[in-house]
Amino acid sequence: MLTVRLRRGCLALCTLAIVPALGLAQRSGPNPFPGGTNPDGSLRPTPPLSRLFTQDAYTEYAILAPGSEAFRIRFIPEETRAGATELVNATRGGSQGSDIEVYDPRTGKPLKFTYQDEGSDTHAIHAALPMPVPEGGVGRVLIYKTYKDPRTYTMHGEDIVWVRSLSGYRLGVLLPKGFSFLSSNVAAQLTTTADGRLKLAFANPSGQSNPVTIHARRTTAAFPPRNDPDMFFDDVKTLYDLGAPEGGTIKVEQTYSDYRKGDKATLNSLEYLPLTDLRVVDLDTAKTLAVVKNGAASAVKLDVPIVDDRQSAHLQITGTVKDAAYKVVNGELVFERTLHGLRNTVLLPAGWDVAAVSQSGTLGTYQGRAFVALINLNAENNYRVAIRARRGQ
């Protein structure tokens, strides 16, 4: 089973082992894939895609009162380096950070942090992780902070204008209560929060940054709360690691956060993933959790019960599934399956090249193997995808 969390370290080691000549060439000459733009504004090439998943972090921006130039941020980042003891979150130059709070998402308890001047108009939060990141685990924190930035938040008469280049995360933007949207230039889910504020939720399916411009105006309309699930707050990601197509065997690795209250986490994904060799890991501690059957349902007992909204269980499910729809037809690899959740990546066996994908996805290469990464932008939690590939000579 390939481990998604260790992809950065594995990629770095594989790159050093496989292409030392390229490393020497880059040290002695210009980087052939620098990204960014040329002086004339034309784009420069970026490196080939090699990350199986993007958008692990979630960021929510709550626009505060008109004229304040301020917005409140909720940020949930991750740290994957084994042994790391802190997570660093930099403040963008020109944005003044204040009212910072940092919590442990596992327990909901406050964490120690410092807010340091890093020079060049930049500050950074250094949050102490509740424990060193364990081998096979993931460190995470929940950060609340307020930014004041007159370049981002301006007024045009009585109207709000909010413009910001948002990183390639899963995102949410809330208007102040009593305001409605005149326009928003990103495709987004729109709903109303429990306190009557309008909220956009969105993600960039290519994993790139989102240049966002919002215009909003006061309204006398009353917006009743809705219970629409925020499909971009859901951090579930599923890797389908395809074995030889003649055998129809697929290794599955699914990671997600469960916010449901209680001391047990029900494994709902087993309803559509009939896994053998099932293993469930608490990613906060890298501890394997025992699976308990209760009729048709399966669950794990949590070491720390979830009792408030700041808490969640960060779980990883792994196992193997046998699927007759994964096969070879007339010399062509065919993977056809209903996928669930926001993010799914299909990793092809070595030696196969992607020939067709029925849904929109990005293409990349991971350790010499082609992959298709799909992000579901629809409120329906499942969709059918067909991927076809041909064997290279």
Provide a role label for each language-model segment.
Residues L52, G119-T192, G295-G361:
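Surface-exposed, acidic/Ser/Thr-rich flexible loop segments
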Residues L11-A21:
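Bacterial N-terminal signal peptides
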